[in-house]
Structures are given as C-alpha cells and as structure tokens.
C-alpha cells in the first residue's frame, strides 16, 4: 500500500531535491498549514498537515499502524520505508520537524509522532534528523525602503529577567 509513487495530495512539497537542505514540517491541522505556508521557504521547506492525534503506535500492531491514514502518509512522504526495511539513504528530507500547538493536545501529538519515529524510523532519530519546533516562533519582515529585498527575521520570546516588568524580547541567535 505504501509503495505508491504518488505522494499524498495534502503534502505541500518543496522545490529542492537536495536532501542536505530539505526540511519536512509536520504541522497540526489545516489551519496551521495556512500559517506555515506563509512563513516557509518553498525552495527547501515542505509541509505535511496531519489531522488530530495519530494512532498510538506503542499499543498498535504493525498492520494497524500501516492502516492508519496519518501514519501511512508520514511514512510515504519521508520515502524511506518503515521498520526493518527503513533505509536512511532513501529519505527525501534532511530534517523532519514536528510543529504542534503549544497546548496539552499539541504535546500529546508530538509524543505520538516521536513514538512513531522511534519505533518505525529509528535510524532517522539516531541520525539526529528529527526535531520538535518550540512555539511560539514569529516571522517578521522588515521593509527596506528603496530596496526590493526585505529582511526576514525569525524571533521568539527570550526572557532575560524573572520579573515580567523587566522582560525583553530578543532575536533568536543566528
């Protein structure tokens, strides 16, 4: 079932095929997909939305896991198989980034996805190619008057003081 050469329609793929540069963002739902589309670099960043919580593969059989639409889509998009047949060299992306909401459900979904990767795509984890995004991450575009190119900055809140009154926003280190 997973040998199909066509990728899931919900995948928003990147243009590059250079595995060293490509990144697959697994995002929680179609609403997150819309926001992620606006902030991604389509040259090397692909997006795959998943619907809700995936199957808990720790408790499920291999047959159930492969029959789950979300698990099957993730395995198919990564393109390296699963279990004993997983081939790291066949992976289509250099990095797989889990991007879930900053709530309890998001943490649960992240845990379920990490379990899927650890149980069925462990070489990807062992190679250090699975990441979890830490929300909130904001994309700012600074308009440069008189120039065609605007500066793009990704930021998050970095608290430098325990007092809310003295907290400052800071750029992420480059």
Tell me the role of every PLM-derived stretch.
Residues 1-53, 86-88, 94-95:
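GHKL-family ATPase ATP-binding module
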Residues 99-108:
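N-terminal assembly/transducer modules of large multi-domain enzymes
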Residues 70-73, 108-116:
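Alpha-helical scaffold elements adjacent to nucleotide-binding pockets in ATP/GTP-utilizing enzyme cores
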Residues 159-168:
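Conserved small/polar residues in nucleotide/adenosyl-binding loops
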Residues 36-94, 125, 152-153:
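Intrinsically disordered, low-complexity regulatory segments
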Residues 136-155:
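Conserved phosphate-handling catalytic cores of large alpha/beta enzymes
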Residues 122-141:
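Interdomain boundary/hinge elements
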Residues 171-173:
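Hydrophobic alpha-helical segments, chiefly the membrane-spanning helices
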């Amino acid at each position: 079932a997973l040998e199909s050469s066509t990728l899931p329609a919900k995948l928003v793929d990147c243009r590059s095929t250079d595995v060293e540069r490509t990144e697959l963002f697994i995002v929680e739902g179609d609403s997150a997909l819309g926001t992620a589309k606006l902030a991604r670099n389509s040259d090397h960043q692909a997006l795959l939305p998943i619907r809700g919580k995936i199957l808990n593969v720790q408790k499920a059989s291999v047959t159930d896991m492969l029959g789950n639409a979300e698990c099957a889509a993730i395995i198919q998009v990564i393109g390296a198989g699963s279990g004993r047949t997983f081939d790291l060299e066949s992976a289509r992306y250099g990095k797989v980034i889990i991007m879930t909401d900053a709530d309890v459900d998001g943490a649960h979904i992240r845990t379920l996805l990490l379990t899927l990767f650890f149980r069925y795509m462990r070489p990807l984890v062992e190679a250090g190619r699975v990441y979890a995004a830490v929300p909130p991450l904001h994309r700012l575009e600074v308009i440069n008057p008189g120039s065609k190119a605007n500066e793009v900055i990704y930021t998050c809140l970095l608290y430098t003081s325990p007092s809310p009154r003295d907290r400052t926003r800071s750029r992420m280190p480059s």
